[in-house]
Amino acid sequence: MKNILIVIITLFAFGSFSQEDKKVQFVGGARSIISNANFSSDQDDTVTSRKNSGGYALIDLGFKINPNASTEILGMVRIKNAFGGFWGSGVTFDVRQLHVKGVIKNALRYQIGNIDYKLTPYTFYNHNADLLVQSSSVLKIKEEVLNYESFYKNNTWRQQGAAIDFALQFPKVVDEIKVNAFITRLNPSDLGNILERFYGGGNVIFTQSKYLTLGFNHVSIFDLKNTALNENAYRNNVSSVSYKATLDLKKHIFGISGESGISSSALSLDTTGGLNDYFINVQANYQHKKSGLKAHVGYMDNGADFRSFGAQSKRVDFNQLNHFYERYTNDQIIRPLSNYDLYNDPTLYSNSITTGIMAYNPAVNNVLPYGIATFNRRGLFAGLKYTTKKESIKFESNYYRLGEVRGQGTTNLRNFNSVNANLEFNFSKFFNWKKEQKLTVGYAFQDTKRTSDLSYEQISLKSTTLNLGLEMELVDDLYLLANSYYFKSKGNESMPVRNAEGEIINYTAMNISGEELCLAGGLKYNFTPSIYLAAIYESNTNSFSSVSSYRYNQFYIYYIMKF
């Protein structure tokens, strides 16, 4: 421990000395959270601890080294101490980030190590499919923490590998051709039955002008043969064409955009040929220049066997257990993963690509559980977006009317309706107030139905989410925060049970009925735009368990710094 501290102090001194010529810079962040919870359930419970307290402090210390104008080296170490540890116990040291990136001959950009990457929504994309409403106030703090922990940024996935990109410019016909390529390793070999698995691909984007863009995209998950005793290598290929055309008039902008392609997924020893399917997504776009109004309407058709795990991997695997009050009642039953847990527990989230169909909660999102790349969906969608010039009002809404392409366990098809809307009203910008005052409203509704003459095939499930958030600046940099989050779901579903290859082998009937309500409030003080202290109290009730409803009150203190 003493030697580690000496090394850190030495690096600080070296960094301070070198910052004059920007050879070495410090980047990173620090966070400390203290929490105290009081838990109770409707049943007499003499086993579960009523009170729980905990917390931690951590610092992510990164050194960005620029040995020359075209090279950057970043190494970041995390030091974390759980509260309750003494004399160094409970302290962990981890390497959080490590990469080298640069430019060769002012033409080719490269990055090796940790890369944050995405391509298109159907090939390689990190869909946020489970948080359907815009986070605000208290929930915004929670979501910022989980996004930081899992490196969620602009729908990218954090991977380990290498990436390159370069562009060619032309005087005529085509303005620019841009090439992107990447390769990452999903899992190592165990020298036994598990083969080395990689994920690679890229795209070529032709920009004819600012009015027309055409892209050719391809990704592949593949096992490297001869890296284990297993000869049954897996491969998942996805190829697509993406496009965007725009007609810019004096008062209006019209356009069309979309992506269409095919996928194949198979094992090398599979004599059936594996799974092969297609997807189509096309939409017409409109923008009114003066008002700022934007609208789109489109059609999507994702085949039942369409597989693209770089775009269908979920952030949360709903088969896992809670880490906060995992069990309760005298029988110590498992507490189901709640909707509000998705905000409350960053450890539920993953930043890895999963080669397989991940579990989801139909109450949370049954319409597009894997985002826009969800397989076995066909239908229409539309959207509306409006922002005033002063950005005092921001409104966005999306609607989906979809159905299954192929029935599950029956020839009857599910029909889906989904609508979500988010409104942000900034009083300070609207009334020209000096102090910031902001109200945010988020609403989501989903409806799933399947009709049949047979009662056991009938499905009806409805879910509603409502979030109200208020931020009021009382005095300079001191904010009052208030949040009301409500979630309700009622109905039934028939969830498929799949084997390791993703084939449906059975169905599980689910009866869903319950409500969640969280009321939260607190104070937040901004030392700077990137450093703040917040004290929050919240009250949660949940009635989804078929055995016993529960409630818990929780008090938090957050200290967050980014540098």
List PLM regions with ranges.
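Bacterial Sec-dependent N-terminal signal peptides
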Residues: 1-24, 563
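Transmembrane beta-strand segments of Gram-negative outer membrane beta-barrel proteins
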Residues: 19-47, 53-57, 65, 69-75, ...
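Outer-membrane beta-barrel proteins
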Residues: 22-27, 60-75, 78-97, 101-102, 186, 190-194, 263-275, ...
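Surface-exposed coil loops of outer-membrane beta-barrel proteins
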Residues: 31-36, 40-47, 111-205, 215-234, ...
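Outer membrane beta-barrel
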Residues: 64-182, 280-281, 286-311
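Residue-level recognition of beta-strand termini and adjacent short loop/turns
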Residues: 66-68, 105, 209, 473-475, ...
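Exposed, low-structure sequence patches enriched in small/polar residues
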Residues: 229-563
